Amino acid sequence: MAREYKIEDYRNFGIMAHIDAGKTTTTERILYYTGKSHKIGEVHDGAATMDWMEQEQERGITITSAATTTFWKGRDGKMRRFNIIDTPGHVDFTIEVERSLRVLDGAIALLDANAGVEPQTETVWRQAEKYNVPRMIFCNKMDKTGADFYRSVEMIKTRLGATAVVMQLPIGAETEFKGVIDLIEMNALIWRDESLGAQWDVVEIPDDLKAKADEYREKLIETVVEIDEEAMEDYLNGIMPDNDKIRALVRRGTIDVKFHPMFCGTAFKNKGVQPLLDAVVDYLPSPLDIPAIKGIDFKTEAEIERHADDSEPLSMLAFKIMNDPFVGSLTFARIYSGKLEKGTSVINTVKDKRERVGRMLQMHSNSREDIEEAFAGDIVALAGLKETTTGDTLCDPLKPVILERMEFPEPVIQIAIEPKTKGDQEKMGLALNRLAAEDPSFRVKTDEESGQTIIAGMGELHLDILVDRMRREFKVEATVGAPQVAYRETITRQHEEDYTHKKQSGGTGQFARVKIIFEPNPEGEDFKFESKIVGGAVPKEYIPGVQKGIESVLSSGPLAGFPMLGVKATLIDGAYHDVDSSVLAFEIASRACFREAAKKAGAQLLEPMMKVEVVTPEDYVGDVIGDLNSRRGQIQGQESRGITIVISAHVPLANMFKYVDNLRSMSQGRAQYSMTFDHYSPVPSNVAQEIQAKYSGQK
């Protein structure tokens, strides 16, 4: 089967925005006008095509990005193939946005005309900057009370530090919003309400808006000629670029991420969507317009490039794993080069494992169609892959390459979880592993000390939804607890202890004497053991028993039973008995010796200190620092990054629970933070007493 659409006619793009800016509704309208949906799904009815998980339809938010292929005839009458990814706007799901942006060529950033640039808009914008994704802007909800297009344009400059090139002006606002002025063609488009937005009339620009339209067209031309010397020279000499030239310059500037063309409308009221689709064709890149993807040669580790060309060796990136109720596990992959046929064997170069592509599917939200072959630029769902996880490269076994991996954020919140019944224990393990395979920002581990299963994720809503999915999809009922901090213990001063173990009770007795110096290990947190025995006071074969005895006590410290760190033990003397001594006797002696010594060597409680980085607009710096100080945090420094301030601090993990909620309310949701483990630090004595009182009862 030959390629149906040329690669230059592909547009792989995503729709990104703050929660509630109308992303899913806009995608629904795109699917409706491109003929993929026969009935428009409304989010507030819980019927949107792209929101296909039960929780999404209940909560009215998009959690997983669904990929959809659809088609659109451009202004030139030629059909184009769109691969669209709908992404979530909630901060707990940034991983979904991150992985979508990694495999897309362009994006539409959606703004709510009433709110303008919102906190999550800033977050996803920063993510798109990281991957250098060309973006257009659609100012949605122009029919809403308080809608202000011009304020939104200003906020793009002040909050995002970006340049918006205004391509359309609104005609009316709020309930009076009727249509838009096209600043290239210099005419007005007025939608007919009775046609569900499918028809509009092209009319003259209203008299009261002519001066404004002239002013904004002038601004548009001024901005775009700057990227082309010849056009700039002509412009300075009074020669204006024609409409085709303007479009060509807007396309170039958008693809080079010099500026962002901006449009307006209301997806819900069906106005402005078709010109937006024409703009996707005119201004967003095809796979040929963006730089070739870089990778590393699997064998030589040299850098290589893969171009968007069917004749190149196959390379693709798995960017999402999803459980489908009918097909089982589906791996979404973007094909960067070469072509893929059903039944082909490919190699996963990250895991160094062969995989066979059983079925290949073209996805439309949650319905699907089987395909035999896919080409460079396609986004496909593959069934039957066993080893592949998010971020892995799949490629031609004869020309292996490892494409740049995705970076996944570390989880910032963890809670203990246990099944409600014994029968659910095994099912819970399977469910958690399946969910972790789908979502790299979700981790599962067993706490060795408490035996509890700990789940970690990007926020409370994130974990909430995963526990909910476990109940719905895997029928596992679970109880969720509060997380506990993994404290440690150590000693702070040198102490010498002499201990004799004697047991005489008929038959062979037990005898061992050890003299050991215990002190903090100057080389770090590990345990260090040395023997300085001379003259055979303790025979060589018994010395491993001395070390083993001390090590067995390290797992439970004298204060609250937490593992001990940073201890050094030096065996300096001892005594033995020809008949009654044994390795076991010396193990028992050294164990008791350390237990005695630990109490006298200045035992101290340690707590995990987290490296916390808060990215916040300047207005909230004082509040953020004050709050971190109140959490026993130590501020390490601050620096400006673009139009935000980055604050670094070390904060005890025990004081970071619920921080995400506090930070959101403190900064109206505009600040973000990341947290990683840094080091263990002594617990202040007043806090240590509370912890000891709490845990010594559990020992």
Curated annotation (Swiss-Prot):
> According to its UniProt entry, what is the function of this protein?
Catalyzes the GTP-dependent ribosomal translocation step during translation elongation. During this step, the ribosome changes from the pre-translocational (PRE) to the post-translocational (POST) state as the newly formed A-site-bound peptidyl-tRNA and P-site-bound deacylated tRNA move to the P and E sites, respectively. Catalyzes the coordinated movement of the two tRNA molecules, the mRNA and conformational changes in the ribosome.
The residue ranges crossing the membrane are none
Q: GO CC terms for this protein?
A: cytoplasm
**Example GO biological process:** ribosome disassembly
Q: Name one GO molecular function term.
A: GTP binding
Q: Where is the tr-type G domain?
A: 8-288
Listed SUPFAM superfamilies:
EF-G C-terminal domain-like, P-loop containing nucleoside triphosphate hydrolases, Ribosomal protein S5 domain 2-like, Translation proteins
Family listed: Belongs to the TRAFAC class translation factor GTPase superfamily. Classic translation factor GTPase family. EF-G/EF-2 subfamily.
**Quick one: which residues bind GTP?**
17-24, 86-90, 140-143
Xref: Gene3D superfamilies:
3.30.230.10, 3.30.70.240, Elongation Factor G (Translational Gtpase), domain 3, P-loop containing nucleotide triphosphate hydrolases, Translation factors
Principal subcellular localisation of the protein: cytoplasm
Tell me which HAMAP family the record gives: EF_G_EF_2_B
Q: Which superkingdom does the taxonomy of this entry point to? A: Bacteria
User: What's one Pfam family here?
Assistant: EFG_III
Q: Which gene encodes it?
A: fusA
Q: Where in the cell is it found?
A: Cytoplasm
Please verify whether the record's keywords include Acyltransferase: no
**Which InterPro entries does this entry report, sorted A to Z?**
EF-G-like_DII, EFG_II, EFG_III, EFG_III/V, EFG_IV, EFG_V, EFG_V-like, G_TR_CS
- Protein name per UniProt: Elongation factor G
Query: CDD domains in the record, alphabetically?
Result: EF-G (cd01886), EFG_III (cd16262), EFG_mtEFG1_IV (cd01434), EFG_mtEFG_C (cd03713), EFG_mtEFG_II (cd04088)
Provide this UniProt record's keywords sorted from A to Z: Cytoplasm, Elongation factor, GTP-binding, Nucleotide-binding, Protein biosynthesis
